[in-house]
Amino acid sequence: MGEKELLVKAQEGNKHAMNILLQNNYKALFGFTLKMTASMHLTEDIVQEVCLRAVINIKKFKGNSQFQSWLISIAINYYKDLLRKNKNIEYVGQEELYNLPNDNGENIFNKLQVQEVLQELNKLPYEKRISFILKHYYGYTYEEISKILGCSQGTTKSRIFYTISNLKKKLIGSEVQ
């Protein structure tokens, strides 16, 4: 059964269909949220809340985007709310960086490079970080990112360009020293 059929059934109240939708998108949602927050504990809390909100609000899903994009939008909005309410949210610690899941079978060198990038990403404002992650880790188009974040394509492109420039400066600059 395809995603559209599952969505129709879930919106009709079929719990099994909703469970399948969440299972099919869990890994991507968890990975995105971990990259966004760089905190395993915060990620677990956010993903749990996103799944709950998705179940409660499934009838509000219009189908204008993929279900995964909708889940990511919920995660982003919830994270924004957390940042607004709690200015003291802890970002990644070294121990969490080195324990990031290695789900792509990367060798240790690539894993360290990814962790270095994630470390630098977490120093940036969340709008820039999220735009970059959606584009370069998940392959979303500028148009899709703009819809998810509720901003113009120009703003999305600018955020990604800024992030790339900043990462190049930080990562290449640290290799030279």
Regions found by a protein language model. Give the residues of each.
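Internal acidic/polar
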Residues: 89-114, 141
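Sigma70-family region 2
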Residues: 11-12, 51-66, 86
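Structural recognition of an alpha-helix C-terminal capping motif at a helix-to-coil junction
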Residues: 31, 45-52, 65-77
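Arg/Lys-rich amphipathic alpha helix in sigma70-family domain 2
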Residues: 59-62, 73-93, 162
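DNA-recognition helix of helix-turn-helix
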Residues: 128, 143, 147-173
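A short pre-motif secondary-structure segment
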Residues: 131-135
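Short, charged helix-capping/linker segments at alpha-helix termini
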Residues: 11-20, 30-49, 153, 175-177
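N-terminal module of bacterial RNA polymerase sigma factors
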Residues: 1-28, 122, 144, 148, ...
